[in-house]
Amino acid sequence: MLRFLNQCSQGRGAWLLMAFTALALELTALWFQHVMLLKPCVLCIYERCALFGVLGAALIGAIAPKTPLRYVAMVIWLYSAFRGVQLTYEHTMLQLYPSPFATCDFMARFPEWLPLDKWVPQVFVASGDCAERQWEFLGLEMPQWLLGIFIAYLIVAVLVVISQPFKAKKRDLFGR
């Protein structure tokens, strides 16, 4: 399995599949926001940023999957998936155990050199409350679904990183 994952990490297909899944999740979030009129909270915006990190890592990996650039993509992927797990866990705890003392910020805080909320306000401006439950599917809230998704991204990322020393076997079909 590790040899297979190493082989996949050196091809564009797996990276593009990951980019497609992250893009589909981002488009779904925008659909929830602009069509279903659900208000994203600050943690939702940060989770969206973590998902953009996974998308960016996938695109970097797809650019040159056989070069050391894929290691940069793996580091970004690991970091983004890990931060996504942290953020969605915090968001889930805020929704499951609401407290007047544990709340999220009113506005997303981006660095001065990257004011995403000013550059693309349709995507990065938060207007909702983190503890408010707005959407449920099969008994799980949106942060709980995202927690599972980010855990899956993180597990696969760890396995792909572990698989890097395992080179694919060369198949000699006609040799002895």
UniProtKB/Swiss-Prot annotation:
Gene Ontology terms for molecular function: electron transfer activity; protein-disulfide reductase activity
GO terms (BP aspect): protein folding
Topology of this chain in the membrane: Multi-pass membrane protein
Keyword set includes Disulfide bond: yes
Disulfide bonds: 41-44, 104-130
Pfam families: DsbB (PF02600)
Keyword Ligase among UniProt keywords: no
Periplasmic side: 32-49, 90-144
Transmembrane segments: 15-31, 50-65, 72-89, 145-163
Keyword annotations: Cell inner membrane, Cell membrane, Chaperone, Disulfide bond, Electron transport, Membrane, Oxidoreductase, Redox-active center, Transmembrane, Transmembrane helix, Transport
Major localisation: membrane
InterPro entries registered for this protein in UniProt: DiS_bond_form_DsbB/BdbC (IPR003752), Disulphide_bond_form_DsbB (IPR022920), DsbB (IPR050183), DsbB-like_sf (IPR023380)
GO CC term, one of those recorded: plasma membrane
Gene3D superfamilies to which the protein is assigned, alphabetical: DsbB-like
Subcellular location: Cell inner membrane
Cytoplasmic topology ranges: 1-14, 66-71, 164-176
Family: Belongs to the DsbB family.
Role description: Required for disulfide bond formation in some periplasmic proteins. Acts by oxidizing the DsbA protein.
Protein name as it appears in the record: Disulfide bond formation protein B
Source organism of this protein record: Escherichia coli O1:K1 / APEC
Protein encoded by which gene: dsbB
